[in-house]
Amino acid sequence: MPTTLRRAHVHRLPMRSPDDVAALEAAITQGTIDPAGIVAILGKTEGNGCVNDFTRAFAVRSLEALLGRHLATEAVRQIAMVMSGGTEGALSPHMIVFEAREVDEGHAPRAFAASLALGRARTPVLPSEHLGRMQQVAQVAAGVRAAMNDAGITDAGDVHYVQVKCPLLTMERIEAAEARGVRTAVRDTLKSMGFSRGASALGVAVALGELAMDELSDTEICTDYARYSERAATSGGVELLDHEIMVAGMSRDWTGPLAIDHGVMRDAIDIEPARAALARLGLDVPGQLPAAARGRIAAVLAKAEAAQSGKVRDVRHTMLDDSDVSSTRHARAFVGGALAGLFGFTDLFVSGGAEHQGPDGGGPVAIIVERT
C-alpha cells in the first residue's frame, strides 16, 4: 500500500518592519504556503531584544491577524510564534516559516532514509515565582517531550534544535506574586530574562538526556555555566506567560530533501563547528559558501552570548562593561558577523542570551539544508 508521510517545508521571508507580513501573505496567496500546515514561525525583529522590546508582540499580533483570516482562532494559537528581538550590526530582519504537509510516497523508493521532522508544544502558564527555578526546568522538559512526540521523534539523539520562547518578569508580575505572599527568583526585570532562558535551556537538557534533574538545583541556574544543553535555543519575551516550544530533528517517518544538523561554537569566533555541520549536510566547501551552495540553505539558527570571563581567547572584551548597550546586543552583532562571513548572507536567526546554551561565550548553531 502507498505510504503517507509528513514532509517539512521551510520558508525564509524578508520583513521590512516588525508588522510586515506581506511576504507571508503573498506566499499564502500563491499557494506556496498552506496556513493549515504551519507548525511554527520564528522571526528576527528590529527591537532591542530587552524587556521593553515590543516589536516582538507587534510582529506576533500582525501574524495572528493575517493567519486569523485563514484559520480558526484555536488553530492560530497552536502555531508557535517565536519572535527574537535584535538585529544589531548587519543582521537582517526576517521570518522563518516551518510547515508540515502530508504526502503520499507511493511505491517509489525513498530518496533519503530520514528527513527533517518538526514538532511543537505549549506549556501551562508559569507562575512568576517559578520562573528561573526548578519548577520551570521541569515544565519545559515536559513540554519538549510533548513536542518530540508531536514530531514523531522517539530518540533524543535525533533532535538537533529546540526553540523555546519563555516568559519574563515585569514589575507588575513581581508585585502580583509578592501580593500572594511569594517571592520571585529575582526582582531585576532584565535579569529575569536570563534566568528564564537559563532554566528553559536546562529543561531542554533534561528532556534530551544531556543532564538529569537530580544533577540540578535552583542555586545552579545562571551560576554554574558548566551545565548546559548543546541543542537548546531559548528566547525571553514580555508577550507570553507560558512557553512555546518547537523541536527540529531527523526522522524516518518524515520525507523530503530537507535535513538538519548542528554544531556548538566554543566561543564567539569559533565558526569551524558550523563548517563541520555544513560538511555533514553535503556542503563541504572551503571559505565562504558560494552562491550556488547558499541557495540550498533553508535556515541558520544560532545563539550568542558574551563570555562571563570578559575575554575571547584570553583577550579582553568590553561587552559586559557597556552601561549603554546590553551585552546580548553586542554578542548578536559580533556572532552574526562571524557567521555571515561563513554563510555569505545576513538573514541569520542569531538570538542573544545563551545562558546554559552551549559553553560560556559560545552557543549552538543549527543548519537546515536542502539536499540534492
Curated annotation (Swiss-Prot):
Catalytic reaction equation(s): cyanurate + H2O = 1-carboxybiuret + H(+)
Binding site for substrate: R56, S84, G85, R197, S235, G236, R332, S351, G352
Function of the molecule: Responsible for the hydrolysis of cyanuric acid, an intermediate formed during catabolism of s-triazine based compounds in herbicides such as atrazine and polymers such as melamine. Catalyzes the hydrolytic opening of the s-triazine ring of cyanuric acid (2,4,6-trihydroxy-s-triazine) to yield carbon dioxide and carboxybiuret, which spontaneously decarboxylates to biuret.
Signal sequence interval, chain numbering: none
Protein name: Cyanuric acid amidohydrolase
Self-association and partners: Homotetramer.
Species the sequence originates in: Bradyrhizobium sp. (strain ORS 375)
Activity regulation remarks: Inhibited by barbituric acid.
Gene Ontology molecular function terms on file: cyanuric acid amidohydrolase activity; metal ion binding
Residues that coordinate or bind Mg(2+): E305, A354, Q357, G358, P359, G362
